[in-house]
Structure formats: C-alpha cells, structure tokens
C-alpha cells in the first residue's frame, strides 16, 4: 500500500533531500509540498535538479488537505516547527527535522535554545529519532524528533562504548568537521564562497553548541549518571558531510570490538577493520555511516572516527528511515542508494 506524504518546508536543503529520496521510494507518494514564501512555484523552479520529477506545486501549509496525508515530514526552521505541529491534526504521524522536540526536558530546551518551549506536552510525547537505538519506540510513535546531524555522528561513535563500559566517561573529546549545507540555505555573509572557501574555522566553541544538549541527555541516560563531553565543531568548505574524530580513554581493541559487535547486523552502519579510517567522500549522498578505530601513541587511548552525510543520514535519510518504521514498512526502503563518487 502506497503511503501519502506531505513535506512541510520543501524549499530548504533537507526538504529537497526528502524529495530526492522519496522519488524512488517504493511505498511513498508525495501529495503535498509547502514553502510559504515560494507558494505557487514548481519545485523545478526552486531546485532545477528535480525537474524530471512529477511533483505538486509548493503551497502554504494552511492550504494543505491533511485528511489525505498519512505522514508529514516537517523540515521547517527551529521554533517554527513547534507552532506548526501544534496546529496539525492529532491523528497525523509526523517526523520533525528541526531541533524543537529533541530534548525531553523543557528546562533543558530553554537552557540551550534561549526561550521556553511553546508546546511542552508535545515535547514530552516526541520520541528521539536515532533509529538504531530507539526502533521499538519509533514504531509506535506519532511524533518523532530527528536528531541533530552533529549529535548523530558523535553518538554513533560513542553510544556503544558507554553501553559496553570500555571507556572513561569523564574524558571524551569530539573534534568535528561539518559541511556548509548543515547551516541551511538562507543567505549568510560567513557562508559566501569568498568567505568560506580555502579555509576552515571553529564555531559555537567552548561548550556552547546546542547539540551538546543532545549529548548530555543521551549519554547521561545510558550511563545512569551525568556525562559531559568536550565538543568543538568546525565549518569546512565542502557541501555535504561530517567527520567526527572522537578521542577516548580505553583499550583500542576493546573499543573497536564494542563498535563492531553493536553494529554487526545494522544495514547502514559499517565498522571498518581496525586501523582503517573513513572519509566523507565514501558516504556522500547516502544513508550510510562509516566508523574506524585506531590506537594512540599514548597507551590506553583510542581514536574513533565516524563519517556521515549530514543531509541524508544526519537528517532526511534518517527521517525516512524513521517514517518507514512508523508506517510499518521495510526500514531501509528507499534508502539503499549507493554513495556518489567521486
């Protein structure tokens, strides 16, 4: 049975990525696309690379007939999603790609996002969307909150190590490089080609990046006690991709074994042989995560390197993976695309 899909916020990067992936999905059909500022336009006018697809025109959200929609992807800006989702039909399944429902604690949300949540009852209802760790909850959920792309990358590298008890929880450092599409499509001076190309810089450093809220929440939940990591992201002049270098204290072989054992049966998680390290070029445009482990010259220390595509596995691909579970479909449906190379 084909499921009818609406994409709210289809004129942004994650919205366009949803369209690209769903176009070849065997059990999903796009029946509505919203883009309030571009209402009335064809998707091919906004994204010429989608010209070959037969898609509905963009419209305003309040013009969509949700009685004909089985599931909606909400790819709207942070803070906008909570207001829009609050007004949607209560029986509608929703996957939200914003940050609005990732943190379960209203106080934590206010700490990291600077203002109270406008829909705290939905915040508590939402299921955190790191698919491989919340499958059962996602299957029965009405509202799923997509993770932050940086937060997903770091968690894939670290969660199994906390679960297996093979690292020092008080000494975890994440050094992360992110592609520019993670900053969204709106015009920003620091994202202009002349400002960004041929250089890289740290941003939201010193423990201020909002994805730290997700790390705190998830790692502390697993450990049963507060866990805080050091995290510094860097913006790099590539369109897609995230590479996280995670420095931990623990036996390198035990670290590698914990990751390999945890992801042995996972479709989209690939742990490389010990000593091999991954590259963002090998997962570009795909829903795959590659993870590598090596030892350090300092005994008892290990380096874990994880890579994923921020627009796919870090956002839209993850969202479709979660939607597949919510709709009772094959979890990997529409997502087995090979990476784009070179």
UniProtKB/Swiss-Prot annotation:
GO molecular function ontology, one term from the record: NADP+ binding
UniProt main location, coarse: cytoplasm
EC number: 1.2.1.38
Subcellular localization: Cytoplasm
Active-site residues, record numbering mapped to chain: 149
Catalyses which reaction(s): N-acetyl-L-glutamate 5-semialdehyde + phosphate + NADP(+) = N-acetyl-L-glutamyl 5-phosphate + NADPH + H(+)
Keywords for this protein: Amino-acid biosynthesis, Arginine biosynthesis, Cytoplasm, NADP, Oxidoreductase
InterPro entries with a match to the protein in the record: AGPR_type-1 (IPR000706), NAD(P)-bd_dom_sf (IPR036291), NAGSA_dehydrogenase (IPR050085), Semialdehyde_DH_NAD-bd (IPR000534)
Enzyme class: oxidoreductase
Pathway(s) the chain acts in: Amino-acid biosynthesis; L-arginine biosynthesis; N(2)-acetyl-L-ornithine from L-glutamate: step 3/4
Gene Ontology biological-process entries: L-arginine biosynthetic process
GO cellular component labels: cytoplasm
Family from the record: Belongs to the NAGSA dehydrogenase family. Type 1 subfamily.
Functional note: Catalyzes the NADPH-dependent reduction of N-acetyl-5-glutamyl phosphate to yield N-acetyl-L-glutamate 5-semialdehyde.
Cross-referenced NCBIfam families: argC
Protein's name in the database: N-acetyl-gamma-glutamyl-phosphate reductase
């Amino acid at each position: 049975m084909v499921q009818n899909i609406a994409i709210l916020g289809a004129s942004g990067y994650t919205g366009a990525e949803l369209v690209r992936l769903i176009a070849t999905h065997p059990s999903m059909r796009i029946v509505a696309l919203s883009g309030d500022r571009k209402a009335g336009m064809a998707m091919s006018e906004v994204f010429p690379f989608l010209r070959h697809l037969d898609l509905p025109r963009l419209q305003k959200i309040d013009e969509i007939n949700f009685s004909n929609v089985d599931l909606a992807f909400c790819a709207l800006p942070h803070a906008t999603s909570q207001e829009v989702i609050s007004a949607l039909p209560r029986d509608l399944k929703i996957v939200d790609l914003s940050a609005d429902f990732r943190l379960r604690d209203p106080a934590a949300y206010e700490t990291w996002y600077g203002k109270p949540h406008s829909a705290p009852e939905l915040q508590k209802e939402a299921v955190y969307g790191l698919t491989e760790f919340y499958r059962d909850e996602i299957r029965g959920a009405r509202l799923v909150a997509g993770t932050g792309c940086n937060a997903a990358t770091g968690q894939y590298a670290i969660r199994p190590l906390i679960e297996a008890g093979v690292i020092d929880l008080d000494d975890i450092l994440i050094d992360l490089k992110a592609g520019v599409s993670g900053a969204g499509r709106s015009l920003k001076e620091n994202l202009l080609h002349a400002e960004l190309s041929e250089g890289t810089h740290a941003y939201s450093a010193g423990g201020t990046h909002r994805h730290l809220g997700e790390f705190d929440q998830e790692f502390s939940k697993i450990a049963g006690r507060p866990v805080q990591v050091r995290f510094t992201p860097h913006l790099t002049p590539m369109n897609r991709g995230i590479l996280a270098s995670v420095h931990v204290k623990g036996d390198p072989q035990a670290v590698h074994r914990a990751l390999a054992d945890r992801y042995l049966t996972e479709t989209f998680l690939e742990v490389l042989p010990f000593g091999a390290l991954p590259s963002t070029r090998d997962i570009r445009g795909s829903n795959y995560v590659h993870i590598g482990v090596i030892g350090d010259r300092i005994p008892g220390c290990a380096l874990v390197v994880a890579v994923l595509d921020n627009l796919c596995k870090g956002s839209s691909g993850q969202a479709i993976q979660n939607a597949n579970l919510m709709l009772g479909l094959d979890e990997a449906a529409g997502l087995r695309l090979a990476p784009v190379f070179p």
